[in-house]
């Protein structure tokens, strides 16, 4: 087992990077302003939009299905491909042209991307290996930055995170299932472990570096060396699968599913996990509104903003456990057959939420201080995953 301080792979090592096959690009004549960008995936390609106008800045060929995650530096996006994690430079905050770079962090079944404490952490489901690098190094390095590699034990769909003091948290599982997490110090020694989290999935870090992992029957909370299991009110199945966090709030908003046999991806309740009091509560969505894992984001005042099947963005205050406002944005929609299928999502930067509407190939910008739609655009592609990128 490699300690976190050990450098396992260097940027100069040619084995750590590949060249994306047949990646072609198109840039537009739209005048570029130095501001935020929106990166959008669609079948067979990637699109970069000017966040202020929602006009196309650049377009790139890619694979039929890719996932997008912020790299954490306010400029780059990690594109999950069959080769690994490919770096898309959106040029956010500059007047440069976006570039789908040849920089690829190779990974078998590339999975979760976590950003915390100046580190970006990549997880390979096919090996359970974890790759860690300084987030800022993406902008200062031509090609792969220096990385730390933590070998996995048994392959599973998992996630890892590194805290600011070097403490390493990672999920535990194998081909038969996932059971919990373990925590290691900087020497690689296991200092805490919990195997009472069936189907462990999703990770979020709240205020004071308290970390939450979702379980099929509740959640695990790691706080300063101790792991606490929080039971869901519905047993034996009450699944928290994704954590939506603000690092300035002790309250984590999670998704929630109480029927293991329910088909599709639509959900009708959220959870509030108080990392200070170590409690978990379930709150029902407003009547007539459901959502998916793609439809939740934290925003102004540490509130959660949820795009519902009724077409409205619902504002949820985790402090009061109440929905406080509803902003109509798009038409009503139905849940996807498969979770990968294109369906509405939300991404927030500052006071602006971006909402996709695949049924109309649309994307909309919403002023969260007023609820007004400020800009709308109809694309010539159907948006799937997307992220708003700001410097």
Language model feature labels by segment:
Residues 9-12:
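C-terminal motif of bacterial Sec signal peptides marking the signal peptidase cleavage site
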Residues 14-17:
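Bacterial signal peptide processing site
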Residues 24-30, 62-76, 102-119, 149-165, ...:
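Repeated scaffold domains used in trafficking and secretory/extracellular systems
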Residues 33-42, 69-87, 113-132, 160-175, ...:
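Short beta-strand elements that form the blades of beta-propeller/WD-repeat-like
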Residues 52-61, 92-105, 139-152, 188-195, ...:
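A short beta-strand motif characteristic of beta-propeller blades
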Residues 93-214:
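Long, acidic/polar, low-complexity amphipathic helices and coiled-coil-like
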Residues 175-295:
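Acidic, serine/threonine- and glycine-rich low-complexity intrinsically disordered segments
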Residues 356-391:
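Blade-level signature of beta-propeller repeat domains, shared across WD40, Kelch, NHL, RCC1
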């Amino acid at each position: 087992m490699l300690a976190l301080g050990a450098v396992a792979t260097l940027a100069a090592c040619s084995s750590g990077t590949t060249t994306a096959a047949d990646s072609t690009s198109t840039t537009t004549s739209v005048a570029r302003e130095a501001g935020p960008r929106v990166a959008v995936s669609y079948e067979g390609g990637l699109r970069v939009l000017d966040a202020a106008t929602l006009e196309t800045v650049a377009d790139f060929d890619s694979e039929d299905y890719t996932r997008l995650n912020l790299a954490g530096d306010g400029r780059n996006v990690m594109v999950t491909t069959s080769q690994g994690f490919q770096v898309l430079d959106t040029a956010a905050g500059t007047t440069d042209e976006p570039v789908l770079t040849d920089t690829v962090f190779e990974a078998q079944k590339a999975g979760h991307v976590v950003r915390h404490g100046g580190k970006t952490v990549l997880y390979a489901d096919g090996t359970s290996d974890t790759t860690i690098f300084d987030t800022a190094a993406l902008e200062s390095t031509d090609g792969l930055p220096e990385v730390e590699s933590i070998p996995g034990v048994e392959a599973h769909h998992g996630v890892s995170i590194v805290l600011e003091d070097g403490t390493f948290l990672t999920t535990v599982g194998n081909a038969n299932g996932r059971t919990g997490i373990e925590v290691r110090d900087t020497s690689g020694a296991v200092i805490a472990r919990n195997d009472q989290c069936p189907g462990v999935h999703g990770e979020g870090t709240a205020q004071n570096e308290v970390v939450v992992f979702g379980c099929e029957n509740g959640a695990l909370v790691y706080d300063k060396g101790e792991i606490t299991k929080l039971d869901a009110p519905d047993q034996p199945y009450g699944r928290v699968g994704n954590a939506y966090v603000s690092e300035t709030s002790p309250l984590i908003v999670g998704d929630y599913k109480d029927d293991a046999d329910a088909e599709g991806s639509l959900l009708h309740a959220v959870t509030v996990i108080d990392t200070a009091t170590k409690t978990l509560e379930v709150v029902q969505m407003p009547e007539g509104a459901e959502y998916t894992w793609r439809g939740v984001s934290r925003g102004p005042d540490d509130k959660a903003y949820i795009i519902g099947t009724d077409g409205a963005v619902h504002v949820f205050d985790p402090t009061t456990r109440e929905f406080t406002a509803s902003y109509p944005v798009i038409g009503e929609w139905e849940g996807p057959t498969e979770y990968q299928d294109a369906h509405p999502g939300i991404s927030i930067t500052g006071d602006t939420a971006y909402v996709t509407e695949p049924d109309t190939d649309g994307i909309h910008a919403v002023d969260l201080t007023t609820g007004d739609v400020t800009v709308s655009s109809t694309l010539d592609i159907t948006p799937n995953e997307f992220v708003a990128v700001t410097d």
